[in-house]
Structures are given as C-alpha cells and as structure tokens.
Swiss-Prot record:
This is DNA-directed RNA polymerase subunit beta'. One of its GO terms (biological process) is DNA-templated transcription. Zn(2+) 2 binds at C810, C884, C891, C894. Residues 1378-1400 are annotated as: Disordered. It catalyses: RNA(n) + a ribonucleoside 5'-triphosphate = RNA(n+1) + diphosphate. DNA-dependent RNA polymerase catalyzes the transcription of DNA into RNA using the four ribonucleoside triphosphates as substrates. Zn(2+) 1 binds at C71, C73, C86, C89. GO terms for molecular function: DNA binding; DNA-directed RNA polymerase activity; magnesium ion binding; zinc ion binding.
Length: 1400
C-alpha cells in the first residue's frame, strides 16, 4: 500500500526523451490501436443523472472514470481498488485524467475520403490517380461510376459513366463483363491497385522524352507525390477512411450550465452527426434498402465526416442552433485562435499583474516602483514560506489569514522577500526584446507602477495612461537570467544599431542644453576659479551666471593616467556637467565642453560605455538625468506668442513666388509647356519658397541678440527646444512661424495652392479646409499601418527564427565588398559606419604604404575604423551572414559584433529573431509617426549634381555634343564623372543623366560645391547625334500622332498616341529620321541609321524640315508628377522587397554584354536582341510592350546588368544575372533607403540575415544521376547531402541555381513542418508533411516552444550542449562496461565471490 501511495506522486506516464517528431497518414490499424473502444451511440450524457451514456460519446467504459479512483456505479471507491474493472459498469478504477488521453473510434459502414487529401490544393488523391478534382468529386458524391476493370469491353480504365451510361453498358456487355464502382469504395480500389514503382519509372521516361515545359512541370509534380508515397511508408489507400478516430472527451467537454442547459464543444455535434448517419446507413444496409437510398445515405455520411474534419471546405458550412458555423478539427488548429498560436506558442502567465505607469525620477536605473498591494499579491507563496520558516504561522491557512489582515510582520517579511528579487516589466506591444526588461522592485504607496524615465525610449512608453504588466520570475534560474541578461542596466545599447538606447529625452535634454549654453558679455566674464566650492559660491552670490564664459582649473589625466591641473575656458554650467563625467584618459573635458544637444549627449554616453564600462555608464546616466531634471526646473523655460518670430522677408518671398506661378500659368496658356509640366513647376516653386521662408525664420529665431549692456540675451525658447532635440522639429517650427506650405490630397497628389499662413497668423477657412486632408490621412494611415507592420514583423520572425549562432568560425574565405553609399553626391552611409563591428574578409591595407591595418579574420573596432578612414581606403571585404558556410545557423565570425553588448557575439545568440525585431520594430514606430507633420508635402526631385570634394575631373565613357544653344550635352547613358585626388584616389563618382547639360570637362580642376551637371527632372529627352534635316516616318495624323489642343490655351502640341489601338496602325513604327543634304538618312558613327524610335506619349519638339545639331532635343517624354513619399510608400516597399515580388513595371536587364539590335516586331511587342561580345554566348532576345520607352538605340553597347527598359529591377533577375552579392547589395540598399528616409538606423547585418534565409533553396537545373527531379526546388542542405552521397557512389551529381523566395514562401517551406504549420496555411502544410512522412528535426525556436522544451538558443543552447556532453560520457562508460563484461575471467571455484569490474 505504501508503495502505491509513493507511486501516486510519481508521474504515471514517463516524459519521453525525443529529438525528432515524425508525421504520417494514420492507417486504419493504427487508429484502432489508439482506440479504447467503439462508439456506437450518438448519446452524450444522461440529462437527469448527468452520467455519461454507455457506448456514447462520453462513455466511461471506453474513456475512463469521471471521478478519480471511482467507478461509475460507485461500487469501487478509493485508491485500494486501483486498476480493477468494475463488473457492474465495466469502468476501470483509475485517475480521471485518462479521459484527456484515451481515444475511441467509429467503425464506418462505408469508406469515406479524407477531405484534406481530396480538397487541399493540389489534391493528393487527384495527383496520384492523375484525375481532376471535378471527376473525383463526381465519383465520391455518387454522380458518376468509374470503370475499374474494363475486361474485354470497349470501355477504358478510369472512364467515368453516368447512371444511364452504366446501365446501358451493363445491357450491352452483360453484367459481369466489366467492373465499375461508385463512391469512396471505387477510389479506394483505384488507390489500392496503384503500382507505384511502375508509375515512377514510367513518369521518369516520359519526363526525359517531353519537350513541353508545362508537361514537364506537371509530370515532375506527379512524380514527387509518387516518390513521397514510395519512400514514406504511407499507403495510398489510407487517404480513404474506414475508421474515424474520436478524440478524448475532456478535449471536447460538455458542461452543464444552470437552468438545465449545456455548454458543449462543437465537435460533439459534428461527431453526433457522423454517428447518426453511420448507424442509419448500417440499418439500411441490413434492411437491404434500395440502392438510391443507400447511396444518398453514403453521400450524407461523406459530408458529415468532411464537416467533422474541415467544416466549410466543401459545400455549405454546417451551422449550429445559433446559426454560427461549427468549429471543426481543422479550425481548432488554424489561425490566431487555433491551438498553435493560442495555446502552444503563447500561454497565460501565472504570477503577473498590470497597472498604470507613472514617472519615477528618483529611482535608480535598475529599479522600478511596485505598489505594496501588488507586491503582496505577487509574492504570496514566498511570504507564506518565510512566515512558516520564522515560526509565525504553522499552516498555509494561518499564513493566508496573516497576509489578509496585513499584519506589520507581513510587511517586514515582504521587504525581505523582495530584496534583490528582480521582476520583469513588459509594455504591449512588445515590438523588440527591449519591450521586456527586469528591474529590482522598490515598494511604494499608491496603485501605479513607477518607471525610470530613461527606459521609456526602449519601451516606447509615455505617461498618458499607458499600462504595464509585471511578471515574477520564480525559480532561481529564472531570477539569475533576469538579473544577468534582462536587467535594464545590461541593456544600454540598441540591438538594431549599437547606439545607446538609454538616452535622456525631453525635459532632461532641455535641462542639459540650458546648462551648457555659453553667452558672451555676461557679468563676471573672464573670471578664474580654482575649485568647485568657489564657483558655487559665485553662482549663489549672482556674481556670475550659469552661461558666463569663465576660466577654471580642471583636474585632468595625462596619457599615463597621472593627474594634473590645467586651465580651461568654459562656463559654470559646463563645469557642473563635467563633475558627473567619469575620470578617464579617454574622456577629456572637451567631451562635454560644448553645447549639449540630444545627439551630443548620446555620443557622450556611447563614449563612456566604450571606455569606462557598463557600471560607470549606468551611474553616469542616472546622474545626468538628475542634473537635467533639476536644471530644466531651475531654468523655467516656457514660450509665448512673441517667441514665434515670423521673418520680415516672408511676404516678399511669397509675392515673388506668386508672380512666378503666374508666369508658368501664362507659359501654359501660350502652349510652351504642358499641363503636367506647369503643375510640376508651380509645385516646385512653392516648395522652394517654403524652404526659403523656413531658412529666414530659422535665421531670425536663432540669431544672437545683444541687450543694452552688450551682453547676449537669452536664446529663443522655441529654438532651444527644437535645437536641443527635446521637443519639436524645424518642420514644426516652420508651420508655427514660417508658412505651412503645400498639402497633399488623400490620393497623394499635391494641391497646387499652398497654405501661406502659419499657425501664429492663423489659417483662412479655405486653408484650414485644405489642411484637413493631411491630418485625416495621417490618422487613417496610422490605424492601417500598425496592423501591416505587425504582420511584417511576424513574417520576418517566422522566416528567421532558426537562425542561431552555433559556432565561432566556419572558416570560409567568401565575403562581400562594402563601400560608402553615396546618393546624389552626399555620403549617406560612410564606409566606417557600415563595417564597424564586422570581421575583415581579407587583410585591409593602406593604399599608399601597403601596410596591413586590419588582419584577415579580425573584428574591426572603432580605432581600426579611424585608421581605415585616415588611410583613405575606399572598399573593404567583410565576412557576412550571406556567405557563411555553416549548415545550421551562422558562425560568430561571419556575424561580427553583438550590437547590444559591443563585444563579439556569443554562442546561442538568436540573431534571426533579433534581426526580425530590429527591422520590424521601426516599421510600427514609423507608421505610428506619420501624422506628426500634418501631411505637409515634401518633394525632393533632384536635378543637379554638385561636387562634394575638390579634385580633377575624369570622365569615363565620354560622349558629349555641343547643341544648337551652345551647351555641352551628355549623349550616352553610361557616362560617369569621377573626382580624383592629386594622388589618383577616386573621391566620388557621379553617373550623368542622358541629355544633361555638362558644366565641367575632362581634366578640369574643381572646388567643392562646383556644379557638374544639371537636367530637367520632369522629362526625359530624345537627342540627335548628327547634324541634318528632320523627317518623320510613320507619324500619321490620328493613327500614330495626334495634335491635341489644350482646352484652356488653344495651343496645339503633338503627342505620339498608341498606334496599335487605331485602325490600320498595327504595323507602324513611328520614328524621327535625320537626313543629309542628299535627302538620304544619315548613318551614325557606331553603325545603324539616324532613326529615333518614339514611344507612346512622347511630345515632339521639332517639325519636318527643321535643321538640328548634335545634342538637340527631338522629343521628350514627361515623367510622372511628384507624389509625397513617406513611410506609407515605405512599409509596403519594405514588404515588397522582402516578399521578393516582381515590381509592377519591372526593368528589363541585359543578361549579357553586347550590341543592341532592333528586330522584327512581334504582334504588339518590340523585339530587341543583344549580339554578344563573347562569341561563345548565344544572342538574347527581349519582347518589350510597345508603350514602354526604350531609351537605347540600334547599335548601342550595353554591359551585363544594364537596364534596357527603366524601372525597378526584379530581385530574381538581379540574382540570376549578377549573382548573390549584387542581389544582397541591392536589397540592403533599397530597404535601408526606406528607413533612412525616416532617420531610422538599422545595421546592415540584420537585413543580411533575413536575405540569407530567403536564399535557402536551390532549383535543380540538371538532376544528374541522383533522385532529384530537375525543376524542383530543394533545400540547400538536402541538395548538398544528396550530391555528396552521389559522389561517394561514383554517380553524376546534380547541378542547381540559387532561388530567391519571399519571406512568406520561405517560412512555409522551412524544414520544420511545425514551424510552417503554426505560421500560415496550417491544413496545407500538415497535409503535405503527412503525405511525405516528414520528420521535424526540432532545430528552430518555434518547434521547440510548441513541443514544450527549452529553445536551442541562449541559456537553452548551453543546456543542450551540456546534455550532449553528458550523453557522450554515458555512452563511453557503458561501452567500457560492456567491453569489460565480455572479458570475464574463467569461472573460479564456488567458494570465491566473482570478481566484478570496478564501478565507474
């Protein structure tokens, strides 16, 4: 008996240790082996006694007792009868929880098809039998017969026969001469009769013979599914069910409510329908009912089973009593409320509470204020145990009473319990890992949680009613992790970019800014102070002001770290600030001897962290916070109406622009410019005016004014707030005191009339109305984008969740080359910022001296970056996640520095999830920030290039002509102007637009800011290369060209119209030709005629017979009017790039280098071919829709990768033509562009990690002698494994090309079916996995969370490692023992005990 009691506390089912999970189709035998009995009746429970009916859906005989250790009739009660089966009610006496584990089954009277294998596309049954889904459904739902065995008749196997045809055939051929069946039995027979090996061989032969691409694809698909069945051990006929499993009753509960009603799971209703129909069918079959009735019943049974498995997948949705669709088994798994996402990936947490947050400026960085009431509730178990240990209570009940009465000793104990016990604070939405941090609680009165101001940025919290949740880590390990990994003091840097995230904001910044202002001419200027006491005395006595320029003897450290004093010129405020700076050689007084804006403060914190370590940084942050708050309060900065200074020159600028706009209107009326050009010019003029007014306003607001005594007066408050970075921006100041400027319509177009007033002057009614567009659009956008951004983050996390650092170094020699990113001549991302914290892929050498700055394989730190910058290195090869050669995960060297710690990355760091959060988090931030600048339009169309460096001009691919107006014009598209140092180093390169006016020539020496070229941003020209007379070809009135009169001006302009849509215009090829004096078409220098093809919407600029010179404009194509760009263009753009979608009007890229030739047109497409330079290559042809403007002419030379038709390139094309490195560079730059526009910093490596995950698959081009199928996509790892196997067997290996998958697709095709199923399309993923008998190796994070294990990252990774080592040791010991056991000495005499091997 005692043993029994002991066993009670042992878990009955031992937790199995497993490393993989396999899924396959359940055979009828398997289903029966799970089952504890057949369910024969649809009854559930007896409504009077509430006891389950026998053989019903809740039967206790099958599923187990309802109460622990008690049979149904009550004959056997208590533990002592454990395991006995009651002879009266046949219930086993055991724990009631077996009702959660035991399954039953329903024996079907007729087989039914499993709807998942039938309807989830592509239909598996259909593919195997090579039949269409429509035909299958006709057979299954009893409309058509199918011929199984034609015998000697003219019928074909698998031919469908309708009822009449079947009867006719029976009459014609006799009843037994052929076999035809109907319903699931027929399909089952067909599946049973399949000879998979034969089909496999046959398909391979057919694939080798076929030329059609579509047929090849179709055969490959079928072959794949045949192979799946061959190798997985599944049998095709198992897709037809003869037995339906019934899940345990406690997983589909029936709960009596008061008033005699019941709450029940929908599954019970669905099961009842199946049982009812099945029983009715059995009865009808026993009664030998007419065929038509039985057939109808069978069809209804099929439908009932369909609804049970997946309600609504076929036919109408079955609804319950309240017209609500019933939740079937598939719905239990699917979607946000399904099993996967609701219960397995996220669980409710015990020991948590939530409350409103308020600011706690007197807290230290590692503390948070916890209301006493809350702490008492959260730490109850700890308090109970402490009360017990101290002997204050003997039972839990007593302890409970003490706590409820809130006795004084309870509070003392609470203090003890809470001491150094960290708690986790979380603010929803948790967009990145800094949304949950650990703090040490400090007990406070009141009911609100107090939060430290410096961590608000990480939580994105403010105190306007935000709430936060508190969680208590219970176990010692959890407390340790909270303290070591999650403590707010350990999260000083942002994981996305390595910048400090514990940065003062708002009041603190304002206070520090005020503290560090220096003003000339204040009383006491030039006084010298020796120590702090003296200075403070002078301040209190008002002899000097905080901002007075003084001299002070400062304690400095020399290079050896020895203290010495030196005299510095500074202000009293900055001395006070200097007192909190940690003493270090690397942090001289100059670090803070300047005006402290938010950016400066951030850089100081960064330096302190780098040079003095974490502890000093935390202390420093707390001190400057206190200093900032104190000085903001002392300064008492506020602003009044007069602080908004409207510039005097405002109206002058407005009037000038008004006249300009009138001029453009007039030009338009005279027909000199089109409506679109007028619109663009007007909008341009007004945005320039707005900028100018804003400049003037800034000049006046920030101007230093002197008062009567010659001292500088106080700085303007508004300017102080904006300039310090505390609140507001120049854009907002412009709206307050400049002019509001242009507004956008909801469609994104800009309204031509600007808002001239500002908020100080007040808006007129019309202006106010115009500005409501922007504000409303902002709010609507915000609501929509939050959801979009969350979804983007979810997809990113899903695709990258199994990316973990698993080794230190993979030893690869591959890498990617990094250069500074220069956009329109300005450096947007310096080389240093891009390679900081990355590993050098090869030695970085000084270009002048050739000495090594950084060795290959070393991490580049700040000092190395400085050296690289000094040496003028332009390009560095670095290791990257993209080129890492590890099979699982990424190596530390390829990843580089852990941005959140500033040290090399640790083993087990989940870099994939960090990357996903770093990219996703600002998405939400940005979308939430659209409405801060009320839709004020910002257009930046760039139309000039100015030099940022001085040097000599070198022009590559030079082709310049002097046109009729005596301007130099760029005549080619690939002309590049480079600015070169005297020592030959390229400082900058600029690609020149076609048709741009050149302001420099080869060999010129230019200064900084010199204009290199300019062009019209609103149209693209077609230029002539030769001098001659104009003639038109195929430019026929109303067929290919139309004179349009502008309604408002009455001036005609000639536009090329779409000639294909006019009658008789299909074969036209509109062009302008240039003829010589003899009337013949001139030849061009590069070969070909001087014939310029025109595209739709080209506006002609010349007439027949006009004389032109090289570089003159023949026609122009206007570009679209400018739309406002904000992150709305941004977020969808990022999603589009990550999803690797083909852009709407994708660019066409040259696959080879060669010469352009125009071929014969095909239907309504232009044919262009490239004659390759390399004679080995084949020529490539492209068909281009005629409306598209092709800016190349016959005979132009293109390089591989050049654009033939402008547009956004499709990422797949870049990968195919230029390779992985170019693709990565393109994606990284494009995505960074969007974030840069918003001023968000994200490290490139995060994007690289995601792109690596998108490149996991290979498309097989040649299958060699392997089992792979050409054209199929297969995992890189699997591809390599199969090739290694083939090479070992001496067979020809397969070849493949890398494929780029969008993140959704990549997530659904991961090696783990658990991860894919819990992401999207659960049914499809599980169906496919089951057919293939897939094994989930449980390598990623999601799969392990789902099966309830520690994740293989972070501390979980080290646990796994330890476990692995232990298992290895165990194995070695066991092997050793076995060895010793085999060498037993010969049997000794009886008397002696046997010599045993020594115990290990």
């Amino acid at each position: 008996m005692n043993q029994e009691i002991m066993n009670l506390f042992n878990p009955t089912t031992p937790a199995q240790v497993f490393d993989q999970i396999r899924i396959s189709i359940a055979s009828p035998e398997k289903i029966l082996s799970w089952s504890y009995g057949e369910i024969k009746k649809p009854e559930t429970i007896n409504y009077r006694t509430f006891k389950p009916e026998r053989d019903g859906l809740f039967c206790a005989r099958i599923f187990g007792p309802i109460k622990d250790y008690e049979c149904l009739c009550g004959k056997y009660k208590r533990m002592k009868y454990k395991g006995i089966i009651c002879e009266k009610c046949s219930v086993e006496v055991t724990l009631s929880r077996v009702r959660r584990e035991r399954m039953g089954h329903i024996e079907l009277a007729a087989p039914v098809a499993h709807i998942w294998f039938l309807k989830s596309l592509p239909s598996r049954i259909g593919q195997l039998l090579d039949m269409t889904l429509k035909d299958l459904e006709r057979i299954l739902y009893f409309e058509y017969y199918v011929v199984l065995e034609p015998g000697l008749t003219d019928l074909k196997e698998r031919q469908l026969l309708s009822e009449e045809e079947y009867l006719r055939a029976q009459d014609q051929y006799g009843q037994d001469s052929f076999t035809a069946m109907i319903g699931a039995e027929a399909i089952r027979e067909l599946l049973k009769g399949l000879e998979l090996e034969k089909i496999d061989a046959q398909l391979r032969v057919e694939m080798a013979e076929t030329d059609s691409d579509i047929k090849h694809k179709k055969l490959a698909k079928r072959l794949k599914i045949v192979e799946a069945f061959r190798y997985s051990g599944n049998k095709p006929e198992w897709m037809i069910l003869t037995v339906v499993p019934v899940i345990p009753p406690d997983l589909r509960p029936l709960v009596p409510l008061d008033g005699g009603r019941f709450a029940t799971s929908d599954l019970n209703d669905l099961y009842r329908r199946v049982i009812n129909r099945n029983n009715r069918l059995k009865r009808l079959m026993e009664l030998r009912a007419p065929d038509i009735i039985i057939r109808n019943e069978k069809r209804m049974l099929q439908e009932a089973v369909d609804a049970l498995f997946d309600n609504g997948r076929r036919g109408r949705v079955i609804t319950g009593a309240n017209k609500r669709p019933l939740k079937s088994l598939a719905d239990m798994l699917k979607g946000k409320q399904g099993r996967f996402r609701q219960n397995l990936l996220g669980k409710r947490v015990d020991y948590s509470g939530r409350s409103v947050i308020v600011v706690g400026p007197e807290l230290k960085l590692h503390q948070c204020g916890l209301p006493k009431k809350m702490a008492l509730e959260l730490f109850k178990p700890f308090i109970y145990s402490r009360l017990d240990a101290k002997g204050l209570s003997t039972t839990v009940k007593q302890a409970k009473k003490l706590v409820e009465k809130e006795r004084p000793e309870v509070w003392d104990i609470l203090d003890e319990v809470i001491r150094e016990h960290p708690v986790l604070l979380n603010r929803a939405p948790t967009l990145h890992r800094l949304g949950i941090q650990a703090f040490e609680p400090v007990l406070i009165e009141g009911k609100a949680i107090q939060l430290h101001p410096l961590v608000c940025a990480a939580f994105n919290a403010d105190f306007d009613g935000d709430q936060m949740a508190v969680h208590v880590p219970l176990s010692l390990e959890a407390q340790l992790e909270a303290r070591v990994l999650m403590m707010s003091t350990n999260n000083i840097l942002h994981p996305a970019n390595g910048q400090p995230i514990i940065v003062p904001s708002q009041d603190i910044v304002l206070g520090l800014y005020y503290l560090s202002i220096l003003r000339e001419g204040l009383p006491g200027e030039g006084k010298v102070f020796g120590d702090l006491a003296e200075l403070e005395h002078a301040l209190h006595a008002k002899v000097i002001h905080l901002h007075t320029k003084i001299k002070y003897r400062w304690d400095s450290l020399d290079d050896e770290g020895k203290p010495y004093k030196r005299l510095i010129e500074t202000t009293a405020g900055r001395i006070l600030l200097g007192q909190v700076l940690p003493k270090s050689v690397k942090l001289p007084y100059e670090t803070i001897n300047k005006l402290m804006t938010k950016r400066e403060i951030s850089s100081v914190i960064d330096q302190v962290y780098r040079h003095c370590g974490q502890k000093e940084t935390v202390i420093f942050c707390d001190r400057i916070m206190a200093l900032g708050f104190f000085n903001a309060f002392k300064a008492g900065i506020s602003f009044g109406k007069d602080d908004m200074v409207v510039p005097a020159s405002k109206w002058k600028i407005v009037d000038t622009t008004r006249t300009l706009a009138k001029d453009f209107e007039q030009q338009y009326n005279d027909g000199l410019i089109t409506h679109g050009e007028k619109y663009n010019k007007v909008v341009d003029a007004w945005s320039k005016a707005t900028e100018e007014i804003a400049k003037e306003m800034m000049k006046e607001i920030s101007a230093v004014r002197k008062n009567a005594s010659g001292a500088e007066s106080q700085v303007n408050s508004i300017y102080m707030m904006a300039h310090s970075g505390a609140r507001g921006s120049p854009a907002q100041m412009r709206q307050l005191a400049g002019m509001r400027g242009l507004m956008a319509k909801p469609s994104g177009e800009i309204i031509e009339t600007p808002i001239i007033s500002n908020f100080k002057e007040g808006l007129s009614v019309l202006e106010y109305f115009n500005s409501t567009h922007g504000a409303r659009k902002g709010l609507a956008d915000t609501a929509l984008k939050t959801a979009n951004s969350g979804y983007l983050t979810r997809r990113l996390v899903d695709v990258a969740q199994d990316c973990i650092i698993t080794q230190d170094d993979c030893g690869t020699s591959l890498g990617i080359k990094m250069r500074a990113i220069i956009d329109a001549g300005t450096v947007v991302a310096s080389l240093g910022s891009r390679i900081l914290g990355r590993t050098a892929g090869e030695d970085v050498r000084d270009p002048q001296t050739n000495e090594v700055i950084v060795k290959k394989g070393e991490l580049m730190e700040e000092r190395d970056i400085e050296a690289i910058h000094q040496a003028g290195v332009q390009e560095v090869k670095i290791r990257s996640a993209l080129t890492c050669e590890l099979v699982n995960g990424i190596c530390g060297k390829c990843y580089g520095r852990d941005l959140a710690r500033g040290t090399p990355v640790n083993h087990g760091e989940a870099v994939g999830v960090i990357a996903a959060q770093s990219i996703g988090e600002p998405g939400t931030q940005l979308t939430m920030r659209t409405f801060h600048i009320g839709g004020a339009a910002q257009i930046n169309e760039q139309s000039v290039i100015e030099s940022n460096f001085e040097g000599k001009v070198v022009i590559k691919n030079k082709a310049i002509a002097r046109n009729g107006e005596n301007h130099n014009v760029a005549m080619v598209r690939n002309m590049v102007v480079a600015i070169v140092d005297p020592d030959g180093t390229e400082r900058a390169t600029h690609r020149i637009q076609y048709g741009a006016r050149m302001h420099v020539d080869e060999g010129d020496t230019i200064k900084r800011g010199h204009r290199i070229a300019e062009w019209d941003p609103y149209s693209r020209p077609v230029l002539t290369e030769v001098e001659g007379t104009i003639d038109f070809e195929d430019l026929i009135e109303d067929q290919s060209i139309s004179e349009t009169l502008d309604e408002s001006t009455g001036i005609a302009k000639r536009i090329v119209i779409d000639w294909r849509s006019t009658r008789g215009g299909a074969d036209l090829r509109p062009a302008i030709v240039i003829k010589g004096k003899d009337g013949k078409v001139l030849k061009l220098a590069r070969g070909g005629d001087a014939r310029y093809m025109l595209s739709v919407d080209a506006i002609l600029s010349v007439d027949v017979g006009a004389k032109v010179k090289p570089g003159d404009i023949l026609a122009r194509i206007s570009t679209e009017s400018a739309k406002t760009r904000d992150i709305t263009g941004g977020l969808p753009r990022v999603a589009e790039l990550f999803e690797a979608r083909k852009p709407k009007d994708a660019a066409i890229i040259a696959e080879i280098a060669g010469t352009i030739r125009f071929g014969r047109d095909y239907k309504n497409k232009r044919r262009i071919s490239i004659e390759p330079m390399d004679k080995e290559e084949e020529a490539r042809e492209y068909l281009i829709p005629k409306g598209k403007h092709i800016h190349l002419q016959d005979g132009d030379i293109v390089e591989k990768g050049d654009f033939i038709v402008e547009g956004n390139p499709a990422p797949h094309d870049i990968l195919a033509i230029k390779g992985i490195e170019e693709l990565a560079a393109y994606l990284v730059n494009e995505i960074q562009e969007v974030y840069r526009l918003q001023g968000v910093l994200i490290n490139d490596k995060h994007i690289e990690v995601i792109v690596r995950q998108m490149l996991q698959k290979v498309e097989i081009t040649d299958q060699g002698e392997t089992d792979m199928i050409s054209g199929e996509q297969i995992d890189k790892i699997e591809f390599d494994q199969l090739n290694v196997k083939a090479r070992d067997e001496g067979k020809k290996i397969a070849t493949g090309t890398p494929v780029l998958l969008g993140i959704t697709k990549a997530s659904l095709q991961t090696r783990s079916f658990f991860s894919a199923a819990s992401f999207q399309e659960t049914t499809r993923v599980l169906t496919e996995a089951a057919v293939n008998g897939k094994v989930d190796p449980l390598e990623g994070l999601k799969e392990n969370v789902i099966v309830g294990r520690l994740i293989p990252a972070g501390t979980g990774a080290s646990m796994a490692k330890i476990r692995e080592v232990a298992m290895k040791r165990d194995r070695m010991i066991l092997d050793e023992r076995e060895k010793q056991a085999t060498i037993v000495p010969p049997a000794a005499p009886e008397a002696e005990p046997l010599a045993l091997p020594p115990a290990e």
